[in-house]
Regions:
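ABC ATPase NBD coupling module
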Residues: 64, 76-94, 112, 120, ...
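Conserved ABC transporter NBD signature motif
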Residues: 64-76, 309
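Conserved small/polar residues in nucleotide/adenosyl-binding loops
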Residues: 314-316
Length: 316
């Protein structure tokens, strides 16, 4: 049997409140093989992101790993020195955050930030890393891959920036990547495109990945196995097909039921005869670029109008 790349045993984490340490993660086990994607799913506060950081041997300020072990390719990350961890992070272990915009320096071009990791770790020269960056942009389906890296972060869309961050994480060809809800802020269409490109590149490089999310649709597309967390406890773990078709625990079943909209819907409010707000035939432009074309809608008392559209469309 192949040895796991990542193995976490009995991991407990605590958070400090005043002088008291309170439990956050209550003895979770986790194994991950090369090329495998594990989905970590649970509601807000379940401990997903905290466990994801612990998988790299790190914690946020005010959090500690109080029990358990974390081994990456035979290296005990909880006993490893700071220099050993620095050598691993970015080169063999990478992290993709929820906010791509916050992860980039707005004063530097995308490609300049992309080459930092490979050159600092001695993986490639600057020229080699720039050429490889273009190839990664192409694999991640970024438009105009030869030139998009010469733009600044504010000059690309949210979905493009998220893929550029994934390219940066893959630059050193890490063995393990932690994806911490990287598509949460994206619209559905862009999210599907980004997820497909991430899944493709992870498979191409046989990279192990932990994908953290609260979205069942996302985890169904990304994960080979799913681990469900609730308030720091592991609820159940199974391969994706089994988890989606035949969950065993009541909490997991309730998550699936919510996603399936099995709850009764509210009865619609009867619209008032006269709308509170009436917008008719609105058109708008940024300079010479039209952005709204003959838009009309009414808003009635007690009712809500939802405006839905992709990123870069103009919402009223």
């Amino acid at each position: 049997m192949t040895e796991p790349l990542l193995e976490m045993r009995g991991v407990k984490l605590e958070g400090r409140s005043d002088e008291t340490w309170n439990p956050i993660i209550n003895g979770v086990d986790l194994t991950l093989a090369r090329g495998e994607v594990l989905g970590l799913i649970g509601e807000s506060g379940a401990g997903k992101s905290t466990l994801g950081l612990a998988a790299m041997g790190f914690t946020r300020d005010g959090v500690r790993i109080s029990e358990g072990s974390v081994e990456f390719d035979g290296i005990d990350l909880l006993k490893a020195s700071a220099s050993v961890k620095r050598g691993l992070l970015g080169k063999r272990i990478a992290y993709v955050a929820q906010s791509a915009a916050a992860s980039f320096n707005p004063a530097h071009r995308l490609i300049d930030q992309h080459v930092e990791g490979p050159t600092q770790h001695g993986v490639m020269s600057k020229a080699e890393s720039e050429a490889d960056g273009i190839e990664l942009y192409r694999k991640l389906r970024l438009p105009d891959p030869e030139n998009i890296g010469f733009r600044y972060p504010h000059q690309v869309s949210g979905g493009q920036l998220q893929r550029a961050m994934t390219a940066m994480a893959m630059a050193c060809r890490p063995d393990l990547i932690i994806f911490d809800e990287p598509t949460t802020a994206l619209d559905v269409t862009t999210q599907i495109e980004v997820l497909a490109s991430i899944r493709d590149i992870v498979e191409q490089f046989n990279t192990a990945a932990i994908y953290i999310t609260h979205d069942l649709a996302v985890v169904a597309q990304m994960a080979d196995r799913i681990k469900v967390l609730l308030k720091g406890d592991e609820v159940e773990t199974a391969d994706t097909r089994t988890m989606l078709s035949a969950p065993t625990q009541d909490y997991t079943k309730s998550l699936w039921a919510v996603r399936s909209f099995e709850r009764p819907l509210k009865s619609p409010v009867v619209a008032s005869a006269v709308p509170v707000v009436s917008v008719q035939n609105i058109s708008a432009a940024y300079g010479r670029v039209p952005v709204l074309h003959d838009v009309s809608f009414d808003m009635h008392e007690g009712r809500t109008v939802a405006v839905v559209g992709e990123l870069s469309l103009i919402h009223i």
